[in-house]
């Protein structure tokens, strides 16, 4: 079954890097960690969360911009975070003591972010200062690392109460997108102690979907920007947010495995070894590959010619 024509495929050469849930591939020269099934499921699940949180933030920003008499001096920091009863998007300031003062707030059901609506500040469920502290530290560090100010924070509350903050590159141009330039941070529940800062890509690179001088469409590019042996949640989430990119192939030549990501959240594993080829479907279950040969990049074999 043909999935779609490959009009836009971004191909990333990966660098070496190890993380939990990844197993070392066979072979004396193999040093890159290959994600196992559990890790691929984790990537997909977290990518879906990033997608949902970003959509909630986008709808909140849209609602904010149609408000009358906006006081932008009171909108220094912004973030969207879930609570049991919905998404909360807040815009406000953070003082030197780390106290967050919201200026504008919005709320939407967890399962319907498009219903984002203004919320009176006195109806906010508690203090959001811990989240604001973590977001501020993360955003400042990301700007310092990648020298680009158009960024978006995504907050995930861990089971133990720790705050994980992803900072992703943003775009306002419907024909230009940015991959890389992302960092994952983890903080104590009060947002004051940074436990982890993991740089997910070495740099930022832009992808333009504008036709070329002779009308040719974007077909793909090769970059060396990924530090891990398999796909990351930020990569899959970016593709889900911007389906115009059509597909993203993540590959590490040492592992001889390619991961073909699509906007529906699927991850297809391509390998020389037939027993390794499989597909993590959008519903989180594994199955056989389901696309025709011409609809996918060939599995890597030795030196990959991109």
Segment roles from a protein language model:
Residues 14-15:
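C-terminal motif of bacterial Sec signal peptides marking the signal peptidase cleavage site
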Residues 2-9:
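Sec-dependent signal peptide recognition
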Residues 178-180, 216:
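Short gly/pro-enriched beta-turn/loop segments at secondary-structure junctions
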Residues 165-170, 250:
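Short beta-strand elements that form the blades of beta-propeller/WD-repeat-like
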Residues 173-177:
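Short consensus segments that form the blades of beta-propeller domains
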Residues 180-208:
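Short helix-loop boundary/capping segments
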Residues 27-160, 205-306:
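Active-site-proximal loop/helix of nucleotide/amide-processing enzymes and allied scaffolds
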């Amino acid at each position: 079954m043909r999935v779609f024509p490959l009009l836009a495929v971004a191909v990333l050469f990966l660098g070496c890097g190890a993380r939990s849930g990844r197993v070392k591939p066979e072979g004396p020269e193999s040093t890159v960690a290959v994600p196992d099934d559990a890790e691929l499921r984790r990537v997909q699940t977290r990518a879906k969360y990033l997608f949902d949180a970003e959509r909630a933030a986008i709808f909140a920003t849209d609602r904010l911009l149609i408000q009358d008499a906006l006081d932008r001096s009171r909108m220094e920091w912004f973030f969207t975070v879930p609570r049991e009863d919905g998404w909360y998007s807040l815009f406000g300031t953070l003082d030197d003591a780390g106290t967050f003062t919201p200026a504008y707030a919005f709320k939407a059901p967890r399962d319907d972010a498009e219903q984002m609506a203004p919320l009176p500040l006195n109806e906010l469920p508690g203090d959001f200062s811990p989240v604001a502290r973590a977001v501020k530290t993360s955003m400042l560090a990301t700007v310092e690392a990648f020298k680009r100010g158009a960024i978006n924070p995504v907050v995930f509350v861990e089971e133990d109460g720790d705050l994980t903050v992803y900072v992703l590159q943003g775009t306002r141009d419907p024909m230009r997108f940015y991959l890389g330039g992302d960092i994952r941070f983890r903080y104590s529940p009060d947002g004051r102690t940074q436990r982890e800062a993991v740089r997910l890509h070495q740099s930022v690179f832009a992808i333009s979907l504008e036709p070329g001088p002779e009308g040719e469409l974007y077909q793909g590019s090769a970059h060396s920007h990924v530090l891990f042996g398999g796909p990351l949640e930020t990569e899959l989430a970016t593709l889900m947010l911007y389906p115009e990119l059509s597909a993203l192939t993540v590959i590490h030549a040492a592992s001889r495995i390619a991961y073909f990501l699509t906007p529906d959240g699927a991850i297809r594993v391509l390998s020389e070894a037939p027993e390794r080829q499989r597909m993590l479907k959008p519903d989180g279950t594994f199955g056989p590959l389901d696309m025709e040969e011409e609809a996918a990049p060939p599995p890597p074999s030795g030196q990959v010619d991109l």
